[in-house]
């Protein structure tokens, strides 16, 4: 019998600060607000799910994630427009539902559709963190249950803060690590919704931005 060895929880402290009427960081590109539950209304269930369905959900999530290792932002002479076009026509497109929703943490916000996801998070992120390693640390936690899957790691990404595109802070060229979780809803054969807790305050602290000190001012 397996026993729990560790437990990690990400509380969106920045969203708590936002709801209290303070905003200590740059404006989000996406829409801020409370995350909705799954469109299928079945996020919590106490029934045993079909094992084959769970395996298929996990495989789809992992295959999509592996496709993200294709990095057009590192192509010689790549421009903002070039990378954006490549991401909109990236192999990831095969796995996302046409009506996908991406729910990011406070500081990034929510995005609708692949175009919104690319414009509000993926493109700025990739332009800022061109030097990154998903696999050195990795999303080593992999769980699936029916039409849901999740991956995570503590930490799960190591990268170099190389531009101001993501979150809007001047590049520091510092190496940072990220605490990230990905929760997926698989619907109509594709990934329909993606909830992504990220410890933004922890990332900002590594590049010299203390959000908790800022709210005191």
Model-based region annotation:
Residues 1-217:
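C-terminal and inter-domain tail/linker signature
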